[in-house]
Amino acid sequence: MLTAKETRDSFKNFFESKGHQIVPSAPMVIKDDPTLMFTNAGMNQFKDIILGNHPAKYHRVADSQKCLRVSGKHNDLEEVGHDTYHHTMFEMLGNWSFGDYFKKEAISWAWEYLVDVLKLNPEHLYATVFEGSPEEGLERDNEAASYWEQYLPKDHIINGNKHDNFWEMGDTGPCGPCSEIHIDLRPAEERAKISGRDLVNHDHPQVIEIWNLVFMQYNRKADSTLEPLPAKVIDTGMGFERLCMALQGKTSNYDTDVFQPLIKAIAQMAGTEYGKNEQNDIAMRVIADHIRTIAFSITDGQLPSNAKAGYVIRRILRRAVRYGYTFLGQKQAFMYKLLPVLIDSMGDAYPELIAQKELIEKVIKEEEESFLRTLETGIRLLDKTMADTKANGKTEISGKDAFTLYDTFGFPLDLTELILRENGMTVNVEEFDAEMQQQKQRARNAAAIETGDWIILKEGTTEFVGYDYTEYETSILRYRQVKQKNQTLYQIVLDYTPFYAESGGQVGDTGVLVNEFETIEVIDTKKENNLPIHITKKLPEHPEAPMMACVDTDKRAACAANHSATHLLDEALREVLGEHVEQKGSLVTPDSLRFDFSHFQKVTDEELRKVEHLVNAKIRANVPLQEHRNIPIEEAKELGAIALFGEKYGDHVRVIQFGSSIEFCGGTHVAATGNIGMVKIISESSVAAGVRRIEAYTGARVEEMLDTIQDTLSDLKALFNNAPDLGVAIRKYIDENAGLKKQVEDFMKEKEAAVKERLLKNVQEINGIKVIKFCLPMPAEVVKNIAFQLRGEITENLFFVAGTVDANKPMLTVMISDNLVAGGLKAGNLVKEAAKLIQGGGGGQPHFATAGGKNPDGLNAAVEKVLELAGI
């Protein structure tokens, strides 16, 4: 029986023997494709080749790719743990041909690998082929069927519809028929009862697809019509975990050696045993799956956060923590302890896990602890919601309240339902679902984008010349219209461009396209599938005419200064804080720079000052730029160049060197460090567990900041009569102010006591109720203190109502003793109604409530209204 490692190696070895170049997995987190957050298929890293944006370096390629499916149409998250085969992170084994072999070889080699190499029983295999689509003029894929007939009986070759057997990259782009290979893993007696043929593509857990062979031969246009693809592509994908299940004779992916080490470790932590309790088993499967996703995401540079891809990772982590909390009794952080087990099973194949172990553990542990605190907060809020609901004589909490818990505090619905059941209560699920759908619709509306077809003026690829030129003669290769948020923009592709496209944390260039007829403003430059896209608000009237591409040089120079400064900061931080410092992200704009780095505690003011001094010393030294352009990656490593985890580098790279600062980098930089002028750190903060952030200014922005500081200092000196020592003068002022504040507080306490005593002497007893009412100008905090003091002294039958004014703002305050609350009076209900008379609103607890308003003249009437509503 092959282990997971042996299976992965056998696939690569087989296709290497067929002339394929074995390439490493691309990062699971995608940084240069706005249409995707995560790699969700093996073909993602080859999109630019498939789309024709770049030539293929190798015409035959194979790999094992880390994938993540948790958003968009490829969203398996809610299935994970509840069945035997869905995962968030999974490995995709794949082989590709770019204009080389096609259907015959793809089918032949798939069969050879499965049957001859892996020794799978051919009698248990089925193949599907595209049945055709008359409405699109597409015939059945008889070519693929004829090749399958060389290996399979006809009753093992099944026609598949467009949904299952016609693969499309998206609404537009390359597409084509596909042929899926399915395997029947049922026992012999089950196979004898019903043919596997009848269960293919019917969601049977033991009759499953293991390999999809995609034959890309068409291009889908924006009007939905198809045209032939100039260079045909083979794109295959085989689920690694499913393959291991088939080879190891298991009925669940989670029973293979891919997951079992993790599941056993989880069971040991929880003091339970896998296979004894279905709900516990689901929890263990969820955690085993999710720890892989979280660890690899952090490794590839995506930290949990509250935005975009980071939010997805945080949701996955919290889902796992919640399952451990609810079903396995894990009330303390526990997931980070699974990392050694994961490294033991996957560290050889993915050494980046080992290199990033300390950071991964730190981030996961702090995220767990943070969410556990959130869970405790959510439970307290749910307790209050339950109490309020019961007080109103109900046993069902509103779906809106449950959604607020979910959306604001990350408190999952099923945990809410579990706690409610334990308290004999329910939740309005339909209302919750309606709130969820409204939120999703708002998100869809905000993200809706309509993209037209590319209008191709001439064939060709883009050459970036921006390292050497800021102006360059060019012509348009293609363009298209894009509509989003009621705005129409145009995307333009040039044959030569000096415009730097946003990447590596540096914002894209702006500028103009100019010819004798007109000037077109370029408002941004983005990168899609490694293709520079120039964004404009209008098209040239003569798009086929040559144009001069001119970059905004002031913006470019400012970006270059800030980008070079990040390199100097990176080196200085390692020198001051230690070699554990690694860049985790950056943002380079013309106005400022932001640099995120791994470090496990706050950087002290003294350390920041040392970093600043080191950077500015290097700036004063005016160290010249040494650019090593397009050098072999091994040569770059020999130079000592620093690479970023989570970045995918080609065989040839660009290295930027300022003396001892040597980094892989594709951005724009100053010719010498002196051009930066000066660096001033303006803030240091935490952005995630184990990750700190520095923000800084350079050059002219530093001068502006120093001017502002000098002006502020001058104003302060004037305020303190030009005191010779401003620090001493300010401290003296603070001390005097503290003394005066203490005197005021003492006076207010005396006033509170005097008011309270006067009120006690003027208690009105009405029908056995001790009523205290008044209208006075008084701060809200003083009224509250008096109310609670009176409640402490009059423990029964107290009814306190006060109308007060502070800074011309009216306030209504009601305090009721517990026995009156038990009798049916609710302070919150009373102030809510009476507050209308002061043009306001409010509420609170049954025994204490307040309401603010805009009309002080209505206070007396409001106080009387409270008494009237209370029946006093």
Curated annotation (Swiss-Prot):
Database matches in InterPro entries: aa-tRNA-synth_II/BPL/LPL, Ala-tRNA-lgiase_IIc, Ala-tRNA-ligase_IIc_anticod-bd, Ala-tRNA-synth_IIc_core, Ala-tRNA-synth_IIc_N, Ala-tRNA_ligase, Ala_tRNA_ligase_euk/bac, DHHA1_dom
GO terms, biological process: alanyl-tRNA aminoacylation
A molecular function GO annotation: aminoacyl-tRNA deacylase activity
Obligatory cofactor(s): Zn(2+)
Superkingdom assignment: Bacteria
Catalytic activity: tRNA(Ala) + L-alanine + ATP = L-alanyl-tRNA(Ala) + AMP + diphosphate
Record-listed Zn(2+) binding positions: H563, H567, C665, H669
Comment on bound cofactor: Binds 1 zinc ion per subunit.
UniProt keyword annotations, A-Z: Aminoacyl-tRNA synthetase, ATP-binding, Cytoplasm, Ligase, Metal-binding, Nucleotide-binding, Protein biosynthesis, RNA-binding, tRNA-binding, Zinc
GO cellular component: cytoplasm
Keyword Ligase among UniProt keywords: yes
Entry EC number(s): 6.1.1.7
Cellular localisation: Cytoplasm
Family under the similarity heading: Belongs to the class-II aminoacyl-tRNA synthetase family.
Alphabetized PANTHER family for the sequence: ALANINE--TRNA LIGASE, CYTOPLASMIC, ALANYL-TRNA SYNTHETASE
Function noted in UniProt: Catalyzes the attachment of alanine to tRNA(Ala) in a two-step reaction: alanine is first activated by ATP to form Ala-AMP and then transferred to the acceptor end of tRNA(Ala). Also edits incorrectly charged Ser-tRNA(Ala) and Gly-tRNA(Ala) via its editing domain.
Written domain comment of the UniProt record: Consists of three domains; the N-terminal catalytic domain, the editing domain and the C-terminal C-Ala domain. The editing domain removes incorrectly charged amino acids, while the C-Ala domain, along with tRNA(Ala), serves as a bridge to cooperatively bring together the editing and aminoacylation centers thus stimulating deacylation of misacylated tRNAs.
Protein name from the UniProt record: Alanine--tRNA ligase
Source organism of this protein record: Bacteroides fragilis (strain YCH46)
Gene name as annotated: alaS
